[in-house]
Amino acid sequence: MKSRIALSVLFVLIAAATFAQSDAQKSSAAPAPSEAQKSFTTMKSLAGEWEGPVTVADAPEMSGAKMHLSLRVTSRGNALVHEFQEAGTPLDATKYDHPVTMLYVDGDQLTLIHYCDAGNRPRMTGKMSPDGKTVEFEFKDISGSPEYHMHHAVFTLIDANHHTEDWTFMMKDKPMHAHFDLQRKN
């Protein structure tokens, strides 16, 4: 009889511990990702090497140049490095324009900082479109001279191997738009 009672108590204790552990796991489950985190996850899906032409309506002599883009996830998945260069040019910052852009989540905002060859660092915040295919960045502020700076960016995902980027550069008060049509290289 005592062994049956002890066995019954043991089963009750095991069941109670199992349910308590199950409830603890439910309450410690990760919260749903924020809109900024969802947008960042979308941006990280672009990691890799890309190439394609640029179109600049305001400067036809620049149109048609083949560009190379490297997108790399770094810092344990917390940052995305975006680096443009003209295809076929060496990585020599003293001779060629190789702007670097960093993307990351800051609180509840997807943030982009563009380290420009103009010597400034515009900061933009991004939002994903309802269909999840476009992330648009709006100018927030700038470190350095605001006279010439990147002011706006739009990333549009066509499919896993094709995306476009539209960047707006401010030349004093005049916007200059550049459209990049990029195909995955790897």
PLM regions and their residue ranges:
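Bacterial N-terminal signal peptides
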Residues: 8-17
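Hydrophobic small-molecule pocket/channel-lining residues, especially in calycin-type beta-barrels
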Residues: 21-186
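Bacterial N-terminal signal peptides that target proteins for export
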Residues: 1-9
